[in-house]
């Protein structure tokens, strides 16, 4: 059952025909190389930024615009 869940998750991250990088929806520090569905990770204290297709330093408070800051704001609402 767990394998079915993982396949559904990776099919949404790397849809058929998509080539490039895509952010992991559950882990701000991870991203995928599509179409191979290879999970990659940013270095410590960095998060993946889809707009620049690169890892950027994490801003841990509400002033940032990255994934971690967005999750931080959502937790405070």
Curated annotation (Swiss-Prot):
Its main location: host cell. GO terms for molecular function: chitin binding. It is found in: Host nucleus; Virion. SMART domains: ChtBD2 (SM00494). Keywords: Host nucleus, Virion. GO terms for cellular component: extracellular region; host cell nucleus; virion component. Transmembrane segments: none annotated. The keyword Repressor does not apply. This is Protein AC145. It comes from Autographa californica nuclear polyhedrosis virus (AcMNPV).
């Amino acid at each position: 059952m767990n394998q079915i869940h993982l396949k559904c998750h990776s099919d949404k991250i790397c849809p058929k025909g998509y080539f490039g990088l895509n952010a992991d929806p559950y882990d701000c520090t991870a991203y995928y190389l599509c179409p191979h569905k290879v999970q990659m990770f940013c270095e410590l204290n960095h998060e993946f930024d889809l707009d620049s297709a690169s890892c950027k330093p994490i801003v841990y408070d509400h002033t940032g615009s990255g994934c971690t800051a967005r999750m931080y704001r959502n937790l405070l609402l």
